[in-house]
Amino acid sequence: MEKTITIYTDGACSGNPGKGGWGALLMYGNTRKEISGYDPATTNNRMEMMAAIRALEALKEPCRVELYSDSAYLVNAMNQGWLKRWLKNGWKTASKKPVENIDLWQEIVKLTTLHRVTFHKVKGHSDNQYNNRCDELARLAIKEQS
């Protein structure tokens, strides 16, 4: 039987572009795993995406995933058909410009083929303890490298 994993993710940037960090919380039953990382020169959107990528990569087998993010960029691309249109249009936006962060979108395509992922938008910097913890992990990753 396929496991259902709950994942919360967040990215942060000190300057945009600037130093960035990402954090993720993976939960299955009573088990929790926290992961985070750092990039010395990045953007907030890239860190939001990297959090989702690294969390999905951490799964040891194909799973059903409920992924929660405060990134409208990430969630809308997945839920409003942006990603499908970009693929259909050869990685071009509706205005015929190249899609930004194509390298990370290609990773997300691979990972969402392996796992059955449902993306959920949560309000950032609010009362969601899991999203707040991911924000803390992302900011700590920046602080520890600075």
UniProtKB/Swiss-Prot annotation:
<feature type="binding site">
    <location>
        <position position="70"/>
    </location>
    <ligand>
        <name>Mg(2+) 1</name>
    </ligand>
</feature>
<dbReference type="GO" id="GO:0005737">
    <property type="term" value="C:cytoplasm"/>
</dbReference>
<feature type="binding site">
    <location>
        <position position="48"/>
    </location>
    <ligand>
        <name>Mg(2+) 1</name>
    </ligand>
</feature>
<comment type="function">
    <text>Endonuclease that specifically degrades the RNA of RNA-DNA hybrids.</text>
</comment>
<dbReference type="Pfam" id="PF00075">
    <property type="entry name" value="RNase_H"/>
</dbReference>
<protein>
    <recommendedName>
        <fullName>Ribonuclease H</fullName>
        <ecNumber>3.1.26.4</ecNumber>
    </recommendedName>
</protein>
<comment type="similarity">
    <text>Belongs to the RNase H family.</text>
</comment>
<feature type="binding site">
    <location>
        <position position="10"/>
    </location>
    <ligand>
        <name>Mg(2+) 2</name>
    </ligand>
</feature>
<keyword id="KW-0963">Cytoplasm</keyword>
<keyword id="KW-0378">Hydrolase</keyword>
<dbReference type="GO" id="GO:0043137">
    <property type="term" value="P:DNA replication, removal of RNA primer"/>
</dbReference>
<keyword id="KW-0540">Nuclease</keyword>
<keyword id="KW-0479">Metal-binding</keyword>
<keyword id="KW-0460">Magnesium</keyword>
<dbReference type="GO" id="GO:0003676">
    <property type="term" value="F:nucleic acid binding"/>
</dbReference>
<feature type="domain" description="RNase H type-1">
    <location>
        <begin position="1"/>
        <end position="143"/>
    </location>
</feature>
<keyword id="KW-0255">Endonuclease</keyword>
<comment type="subunit">
    <text>Monomer.</text>
</comment>
<dbReference type="InterPro" id="IPR002156">
    <property type="entry name" value="RNaseH_domain"/>
</dbReference>
<dbReference type="InterPro" id="IPR050092">
    <property type="entry name" value="RNase_H"/>
</dbReference>
<dbReference type="InterPro" id="IPR036397">
    <property type="entry name" value="RNaseH_sf"/>
</dbReference>
<dbReference type="InterPro" id="IPR012337">
    <property type="entry name" value="RNaseH-like_sf"/>
</dbReference>
<dbReference type="GO" id="GO:0004523">
    <property type="term" value="F:RNA-DNA hybrid ribonuclease activity"/>
</dbReference>
<feature type="binding site">
    <location>
        <position position="135"/>
    </location>
    <ligand>
        <name>Mg(2+) 2</name>
    </ligand>
</feature>
<dbReference type="InterPro" id="IPR022892">
    <property type="entry name" value="RNaseHI"/>
</dbReference>
<dbReference type="GO" id="GO:0000287">
    <property type="term" value="F:magnesium ion binding"/>
</dbReference>
<feature type="binding site">
    <location>
        <position position="10"/>
    </location>
    <ligand>
        <name>Mg(2+) 1</name>
    </ligand>
</feature>
